[in-house]
Amino acid sequence: MEGVSTAKRALAVLLTAVLALGTVLLATGCSSNSGEGSSNSDPITVVFLPDNSSADMEASRDAVAEIIKNATGRDVEIMTTTDYNVAIEALVSGQAQMGYLGAEGYVQANEKNDKVQCAFTASDANGTLDEACYYSRICVKTENADQYASGDTYSIDNIKGKSFSFVSATSTSGFAIPSSSIVSHFGLESSDQLLEDGTFFSSVMFGDSHQGSAVNLLSGNADAAAFDDIDVDMYFDLVSGEPNTVGAVYQVKDDAAAPFDTVRGEQFTIIGITPVLNAPFCYNTDTLSEDEQQAITEAMTSADTAANSAIFYDGEDENATGLVEKESDKTAFVAVEDSWYDPI
């Protein structure tokens, strides 16, 4: 009887040990799985196009990062780029969870991955989307503007055979819009004809940013160039004409920062111009929870953000920089849906 009792006691001890080990393993397994499945401790990466990646835009990027961090409780990392495609692919792949893209860049990103969705964009002066646009411009050096005169105004009639600078093949206002205008104006088959040296233009170059394209023109490397207003006008003074109209003349400021420090005092004249839908901030919705998306959108479209001078800059202040010009007290970020970009 004593042998049986001893065996029972040994079996009981063994079962207790197994159960205890199972409990430990279960707890460890749950803990491990919980850590792997949680991404709330990871930083949110926000990618910016080359035009907003320059050193003088750092305060603007930091202001956006701070708002997102306060809204989500997560750290934020800023990703700057020197290539439009890199920014688009970062958002498409999920390497970046948010991005500030041009309208064309957003459409391309959404076509590659429908989980990339626009969230909010800058409003018009009335705080609405009714006239929420900026401008794509085709410009020439003012000293050569007479070559493009058409009566008492200017036109793009004589750009054929000239050297031309675009921003990037994925830029909305630096390629898609101006190339569409040129194709339509000259009855070309497609914009592909604009990309090869000697086909339509004598030579074609890319600035890789709106600033770079403008410098290509002002330095004399290109006879004509496409670039927008919102990414470069803080470096210029309006010399004559109405802002963003054909015939308007702009001059690089005497104290303009790089890359315009090499072309200070140079002037350009607008010979073609087209309005463009404002650029959106976008989410990769696979990488941010719905609650996080809502929290960020609410924070970025708030009155506090609209009053943040690091993001919404005063156009009357020659030294001010930011992502969006504060056209009025009503200028702010407003929520936007994918369908708003259908015209692109």
Where are these regions (language model features)?
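A bilobed periplasmic-binding-protein/Venus flytrap-type ligand-binding module shared by bacterial periplasmic
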Residues: 50, 133-149, 272-290
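A conserved helix-loop-strand patch within extracytoplasmic ligand-binding domains
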Residues: 122-186
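Pocket-lining segment of extracytoplasmic ligand-binding domains
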Residues: 171-289
